[in-house]
Amino acid sequence: MIISIIIFSILSFILGVIVSLVSCFCKVKSNLSLINDIDELLPQMQCAQCGYPGCYAYSQAIVDGNENIYKCIPGGKEVVLKLENLLNKSDHRGNFLESLEDSVTYSIVEIDENNCVGCSKCRLVCPVDAVVGTYNFRHTVLIDSCTGCNLCIPLCPTNCIKKKIMFYE
């Protein structure tokens, strides 16, 4: 009788450990799915205006509970509403959606081509290839491609790269 109780207790403990491990692995998979769903809703500008290096990192922070869903400036009201719907959250920030005017700003960079020496440092560091030009010739920025990461600004030896504030329309 005692032996059967001991065997039953050991088997119950082992089964409990197995169930715990399986539930942990299933939770990770559902988190990855949720991270990917959130990432698909974001505009994929990799602008870092939310404080994260890219949209995927911001998605991970949202799922981990370390960040709120209201930091994607380029996404505007549309993305906030989609994220609220996906995560079943309502606007806990009061008038946040009303404060998102139609003229929300974002930043890009602009090169003063008259002062550009063509060193190509900006072109080489640009993560989205928004800077075009060849070595020893003037460079320019493709405004539609620039994400405003500003990685190129400190590298310019002539300080001809400036941040420019744009408005969403």
Swiss-Prot record:
Binding site for [4Fe-4S] cluster 1: 47, 50, 55, 72
Principal location listed in the UniProt entry: membrane
Alphabetic keyword roster: 4Fe-4S, Cell inner membrane, Cell membrane, Electron transport, Iron, Iron-sulfur, Membrane, Metal-binding, Repeat, Translocase, Transport
One Gene Ontology molecular-function label: metal ion binding
Domain 4Fe-4S ferredoxin-type, first and last residues per copy: 107-136, 137-166
Binding sites annotated in the UniProt record for [4Fe-4S] cluster 2: 116, 119, 122, 156
Residues the entry annotates as binding [4Fe-4S] cluster 3: 126, 146, 149, 152
Cofactor annotation comment: Binds 3 [4Fe-4S] clusters.
Segments for region (Hydrophobic): 1-23
Matching Pfam families: Fer4_21 (PF14697), FeS (PF04060)
Enzyme Commission number(s): 7.-.-.-
A GO biological process held by the record: electron transport chain
Domain of life where this protein originates: Bacteria
EC class of the enzyme, as a word: translocase
InterPro entries the record matches: 4Fe-4S_dom (IPR007202), 4Fe4S_Fe-S-bd (IPR017896), 4Fe4S_Fe_S_CS (IPR017900), Elect_transpt_cplx_RnfB/RsxB (IPR010207), Fe-S_Ferredoxin (IPR050572), RnfB/RsxB_Proteobac (IPR016463)
Gene3D superfamilies: 3.30.70.20, Electron transport complex subunit B, putative Fe-S cluster (1.10.15.40)
GO cellular component terms listed in the entry, alphabetical order: plasma membrane
Subunit and interaction comment: The complex is composed of six subunits: RnfA, RnfB, RnfC, RnfD, RnfE and RnfG.
Protein name per Swiss-Prot or TrEMBL: Ion-translocating oxidoreductase complex subunit B
Originating organism: Buchnera aphidicola subsp. Baizongia pistaciae (strain Bp)
Upper taxonomic lineage: Bacteria, Pseudomonadati, Pseudomonadota, Gammaproteobacteria, Enterobacterales
